[in-house]
Curated annotation (Swiss-Prot):
HAMAP family: DapL_aminotrans_1 (MF_01642). This is LL-diaminopimelate aminotransferase. It comes from Synechococcus sp. (strain CC9311). Its cofactor is pyridoxal 5'-phosphate. Pfam families: Aminotran_1_2. The lineage of its organism: Bacteria, Bacillati, Cyanobacteriota, Cyanophyceae, Synechococcales.
Length: 408
């Protein structure tokens, strides 16, 4: 009989969102008349920007002609998209990132997991707690952790608690680590990092020859012009950081799939024999071997994000969701609930009322208000007693959800 990857058996009972789905399905089966409002998983609800739709329609028409047909494209992404990304997302903010250092993909979740393919198994890993579950689970699947304890934490990982007590700012580890996962604006807490805070991480990484994996999937939601959008706005970050970004939330590409990873040339790791190896070459080889690239049609849609019309439409989308977040913050605060986040990110992180644990509050909202959110404990032990609500929904649904919660 074929053997399975035993590391998968170390995973906790269920990935957070499938467990939410299981409970919601059971509730809906028992209460088919219930009108659920989903403010849980961070999936967008508004239509794709017109500029992106027009570009994809045009690309489809091209594909219908012999002259305009495109088969396999470059695994790294088409040059015209990579150049637009480099110019508008990085160089415009003073980051020395070239088009060649950008790899277009079908999702930052995939990339933040797949990056482990080019990193050794003996690295000491640090994650915040609470944390986006994919960072932890992908390391478990790859055999980079020990077993999980009663508190849900895995052996072999360094956990960096973030809470209201420390302003949701992870403290620099007291011991050396090799791999650091940072996400700003943060999922799930909605917290942001200043340049000074990121500078401390870059200084630590350079001093300890560590690698920062920086998830900037929500950078478009930052409202304060003084806050950094990229780790590469920090001097020295090219020497110690890989950055992940996505078109999913700012441009509504959750269903069309397009993202990017930045691997600076000159960024190095260490081989078993002690020699230094450039990570760009390893990632390029990995993508060329295991990935066929994002479709031509989708990349044309992503390129349109950088057109004048696309920029305005994306800005309007972001503003719409941030207005939703402001409504959620205002209404929860008026109801006497302690709230965090939601000012530079599309997530509101609330303290569960009356000392309820996270999953009890989930069930309470589901059963009494027919509102679906995300239990904070699903993001880690330090998330117990917190709860995440997403601003990704229609205005009418957000208003109705808040009315239901107020009436509890």
């Amino acid at each position: 009989m074929v053997k399975v990857n035993g590391n998968y058996l170390k995973l906790k009972a269920g990935y957070l969102f499938p467990e939410i789905g299981r409970r919601v399905k059971a509730f809906s089966s028992a209460n088919p008349e219930a009108q659920l409002i989903r403010l849980g998983i961070g999936d967008v609800t508004e239509p794709l920007p017109q500029a992106c739709r027009d570009a994809m329609k045009s690309a489809i028409d091209e594909m219908g002609t012999a002259e305009g047909f495109h088969g396999y494209g470059p695994e790294q992404g088409y040059a015209w998209l990579r150049e637009a990304i480099a110019r508008d997302d990085f160089q415009a903010r003073g980051c020395e990132i070239s088009a060649e250092e950008i790899f277009v993909s079908d999702g930052s979740k995939c990339d933040s997991s797949n990056i482990l393919d080019i990193l050794g198994s003996g690295n000491r890993i640090a994650v915040t707690d609470p944390v986006y579950p994919v960072y932890v689970d992908s390391n478990v699947m790859a055999g980079r952790t020990g077993e999980s304890g009663d508190d849900g934490r895995y052996g072999g990982l360094t956990y960096l608690p973030i809470s209201a007590d420390n302003g949701f700012a992870a403290q620099i580890p007291s011991e050396p680590v090799d791999l650091i996962y940072l996400c700003y604006p943060n999922n799930p807490t909605g917290a942001v990092a200043t340049k000074a805070q990121l500078k401390k991480w870059v200084d630590y990484a350079r001093a300890n020859k560590a690698l920062i994996l920086f998830d900037a999937a929500y950078e478009a939601f930052i409202q304060d012009p003084e806050l950094p959008h990229s780790i590469y706005e920090i001097e020295g970050a090219r020497d110690c950081a890989i950055e992940f970004r996505s078109f999913s939330k700012n441009a509504g590409f959750t269903g069309t799939r397009c993202a990017l990873t930045v691997v600076p040339k000159g960024l190095k790791g260490k081989a078993d024999d002690g020699s230094e190896v450039e990570l760009w070459g390893l990632w390029n080889r990995r993508q060329s071997t295991k990935f066929n690239g994002v479709s031509y049609i989708i990349q044309r849609g992503a390129e349109a994000v950088y057109s004048d019309a696309g920029k305005q439409e994306v800005k309007a989308l972001v503003s719409f969701y941030m207005e939703n977040a402001a409504i959620i913050r205002r209404e929860l605060s008026a109801a006497g609930i302690e709230v965090h986040g939601g000012q530079h990110a599309p997530y509101v992180w609330l303290k569960t009322p009356s000392g309820m644990d996270s999953w009890s509050f989930f069930d309470h909202l589901l059963q009494k208000a027919n509102v679906v959110g995300t239990p904070g404990s699903g993001f880690g032990a330090a998330g117990e007693g917190y709860f995440r609500l997403s601003a990704f929904n229609s205005r009418s649904n957000v208003d109705e959800a808040m009315a239901r919660i107020r009436n509890l």
